[in-house]
Curated annotation (Swiss-Prot):
Protein name as it appears in the record: Transcription factor hmgR
Induction: Expression is induced by L-tyrosine.
SMART domains per record: GAL4 (SM00066)
Region (Disordered): 108-142, 661-683
Organism: Aspergillus fumigatus (strain ATCC MYA-4609 / CBS 101355 / FGSC A1100 / Af293) (Neosartorya fumigata)
PANTHER family per the UniProt record, alphabetical: TRANSCRIPTIONAL ACTIVATOR ARO80-RELATED, ZN(II)2CYS6 TRANSCRIPTION FACTOR (EUROFUNG)
InterPro entries reported in the protein's UniProt record: AAA_Catabolism_Regulators (IPR052780), Zn2-C6_fun-type_DNA-bd_sf (IPR036864), Zn2Cys6_DnaBD (IPR001138)
Domain of life: Eukaryota
Entry function: Transcription factor; part of the L-tyrosine degradation gene cluster that mediates the biosynthesis of the brownish pigment pyomelanin as an alternative melanin. Acts as a transcriptional activator for the genes of the tyrosine degradation cluster.
Keyword presence, Membrane: no
DNA-binding region (UniProt annotation): 24-59
Pfam families: Zn_clus
GO MF entries: DNA binding; DNA-binding transcription factor activity, RNA polymerase II-specific; zinc ion binding
Length: 748
């Protein structure tokens, strides 16, 4: 006769287990006999034990069994991961980074606890607290492969320069101080315009011409120093000690840039001979927001990170090492903090650039507008100066609004001024100096305006966002924005309209706005899973996906894959290594959106395809590392950790789609040919059918009705493990400073 073990998931989840011998925590620590006494029936009387009664101590028992610790912890971690990952609205670029940071933080803590559980109990309690695994083999390795670093540090070839240009640079103070030679200075400028300026819309190619270097040095000192500073980080000079000189030159140039910015802010310049307060300085500040100095990752030389006027005890400081949380604090210092400093620095630089633009009359008309170009009248035509002014107007609009959207701040650009910039038309006669640039900026400005409208409509407040998700009004709003996105794409996203670098840039920006907009459907699915789930069940699958929400999720998945595939292409041609910071922010955000969408559920073929895209992105980031402290190397490490976990934890689940009667229910259009083609659902397990490059181009999305139960993969979801509640003041934890770092946690 077959004897079946009673299910642990039956009607008695809180069953009490009896042990032959029990000891309180105090007796176990001392390895002493725990005498509870016996009653008339021979059973133990219960706490307190004789020893605790005699010493007047609390007599506490641990109800958990030692062999069960790791398993229960893993189950809870999985539930915490799924719920927090899928419920969290990624409404700014910082939210995605915080997800990555907290997940790595959780892995370090979990690895530490697992190793602690594997040690003998005596070792754990010898010092009164569990032993941590600081420095163990479970720590995530952030080092860059030596071959990648060797490629990044490969010396460049010096430029061929005429004697006249060399004599011009010989008068430069940096050359006279011996930091580098005149020919090396020209090499830095040439390589910046060759490898980096083409990836950013800030500068024209006016200063790329050697004949104009004299004007760059004499009339745009801030811009000149900024170009040299940025280029010196990305390019290593040939000769003995090239790498060491690279660090020295870059650091000295950054120090000089800081001095110039200080003079700008505090007005430390003769008004009769202005060299700092000009349009070139505005362009320099924009470049610094695109490419950061290496010093961003290190504390200031004078006082370190401590700016307090009082001495604080080491244990009370934010990063004081208390043992158990050292891994979390290490991740905060290495990953989250540099990214936040990047946003903070860019925000202040752009604010200074906007203030200087107002001072110079960049947005004025008439005589006031001439103040910005008095210094350039000797060597620039009027049309060139007017074009440079209009470029600055548009660049400031896009850069400020994009960063404000990313970090969740109110834009520094006044509403009236924004409308004025958007309504101004560039003169037809100026197009000869940069028609493709003007087309690119027009498209980017329209897309920025559209993204800002999406944010204002969906996320004016957390309470309002939740109300829209629960009432189904978000569908009407998406029906309003989706045609606008399609119209923008049809008008602007054409390869023949842009240079290749500009097209790649606007391609990534478009698909990110597309992902950002359709992610509202993902959040609606999670809210219904929370509302409809049975709290008594151990696992609640988030399968109450309406067809219209399934369509939105497919848009998110496809948009993310489009971004990451483009990133892989940039890596193949060597452009990713020189890309601005905003590209790496888009990579991080897109990867998080993709993993969130996949966790809700996906077909095996789409899941395999998406995870392969993530793997290629990881390889692209690693193979194009700038140095061992660039954020791309850390992004790659974190992404690899979570992609491998998603592969293990996305399990096959039976489809139990709940047909809702609310107005949110809508049927997607599925051609009969597609339904018949997907009748054999076991085929994707063996082969990968060709997937269209852009599903939205096909005019339909695969229907949920055509997906067999064994072809649907999703992440286990436990709504009872929600890390926050709707009643918590109406604010998402992602906006609460330290509460930003709470998100998902996959077990090892």
């Amino acid at each position: 006769m077959e004897i079946r073990r009673p299910s642990r998931h039956g009607n008695h989840p809180d069953r009490t287990y009896q042990r032959t011998y029990k000891a309180c925590i105090s007796c176990r620590q001392r390895k002493a006999k725990c005498d509870l006494g016996t009653g008339p029936d021979g059973l133990p009387l219960g706490p307190p034990c004789a020893k605790c009664r005699r010493e007047q101590k609390p007599c506490l028992f641990d109800e958990k069994r030692a062999w069960e610790r790791v398993k229960k912890r893993g189950t809870q971690s999985t539930s915490n991961l799924a719920n927090s990952m899928m419920r969290t609205v990624v409404s700014s670029g910082n939210d995605a980074l915080n997800i990555l940071f907290e997940a790595a933080n959780a892995q370090s803590q979990e690895d530490s606890m697992i190793e602690s559980d594997s040690l003998p109990e005596t070792e754990q309690h010898r010092s009164g607290h569990p032993v941590t695994s600081e420095g163990s083999s479970n720590q995530i390795d952030l080092t860059v492969p030596p071959d990648v670093l060797e490629k990044a540090m490969r010396p460049v070839e010096l430029s061929h320069v005429s004697k006249d240009v060399l004599s011009t640079w010989e008068a430069c103070r940096f050359v006279r101080m011996g930091w580098f030679t005149a020919r090396e200075a020209v090499t830095f400028i040439d390589l910046f315009f060759k490898n980096m300026s083409i990836l950013s819309p800030v500068l024209t190619d006016f200063y790329a011409d050697h004949k104009n270097h004299r004007w760059l040095i004499a009339h745009d000192p801030v811009l000149c120093c900024t170009i040299l500073m940025i280029s010196s980080r990305y390019h290593v000079l040939p000769g003995v000690g090239g790498q060491s000189r690279n660090f020295f030159i870059h650091h000295r140039l950054w120090q000089h840039c800081q001095q110039l910015v200080t003079r700008l802010i505090f007005g430390q310049e003769l008004s009769s001979q202005p060299k700092i307060r000009n349009i070139g300085t505005i362009e320099a500040l924009l470049l610094m927001s695109d490419w950061h100095p290496r010093s961003l990752h290190f504390p200031p030389e004078s006082d370190g990170w401590d700016s307090d006027l009082v001495t604080i005890d080491l244990e009370s400081t934010e990063y004081g090492d208390d043992g158990s949380n050292s891994s979390a604090k290490r991740w905060a210092k290495d990953m989250s903090e540099p990214a936040k400093r990047s946003d903070q620095m860019s925000w202040m630089l752009l604010g200074s650039a906007l203030s200087l633009a107002h001072e110079l009359g960049i947005y004025e008309t008439g005589d006031k507008a001439r103040d910005a170009f008095v210094a350039y009248e000797r060597f620039m035509t009027k049309d060139q100066m007017r074009l440079r002014r209009q470029r600055a107007q548009r660049l400031l609009y896009v850069y400020i609004n994009q960063l404000a959207w990313r970090i969740g701040c109110v834009s520094l650009m006044p509403q009236g001024l924004s409308h004025s910039i958007l309504n101004r038309q560039t003169s037809r006669e100026l197009s000869q100096y940069g028609e493709e640039w003007l087309t690119f900026m027009d498209s980017w400005m329209d897309l920025t305006k559209l993204a800002k409208s999406v944010t204002d409509m969906f996320f004016p407040s957390v309470t309002f966002a939740r109300q829209q998700l629960q009432s189904g009004r978000y569908i009407d709003l998406l029906d309003h924005f989706r045609p606008l996105l399609d119209k923008w794409k049809e008008r602007y996203l054409q390869p023949q309209l842009h240079d290749k670098p500009f097209y790649d840039d606007i391609f990534i920006e478009y698909h990110f706005v597309r992902v950002y907009t359709h992610s509202v459907g993902m959040q609606a699915v999670v809210e219904r899973a929370i509302a409809d789930g049975n709290a008594d069940e151990e696992e609640v699958r988030p399968m109450n996906i309406d067809p219209i929400d399934y369509e939105y999720i497919q848009e998110v998945i496809d948009g993310c894959c489009q971004i990451l595939e483009k990133v892989t292409q940039l890596a193949d041609i060597g452009a990713l290594r020189f890309s601005p910071v905003r590209i790496f922010v888009r990579i991080t955000s897109a990867s998080i959106f993709l993993m969130k969408a996949l966790s809700l559920g996906a077909r095996q073929a789409k899941l395999r395809e998406s995870l392969d895209v993530l793997e290629r992105t990881i390889q692209a980031l690693r193979s194009n590392a700038l140095d061992d402290i660039h954020l791309s190397t850390r992004y790659a490490t974190l992404l690899e950790t979570h992609v491998s976990r998603l592969r293990r934890h996305l399990v096959a689940s039976c489809k139990s789609l709940k047909r809702r009667r609310e107005s949110t229910t809508r049927h997607s259009m599925v051609p009969p040919s597609y339904a018949s083609a997907t009748s054999d659902e076991h085929a994707p397990l063996i082969t990968n059918p060709p997937v269209p490059q852009n599903m939205s181009d096909m005019g339909f999305t695969p229907s949920l009705n055509d997906i067999a139960a064994d072809d649907w993969l999703s992440l286990p979801f436990d709504p009872s493990m929600a890390p926050f509640s709707i009643s918590s003041g109406g604010q998402f934890p992602a906006y609460e400073g330290g509460g930003l770092n709470f998100l998902w946690n996959l077990p090892s």
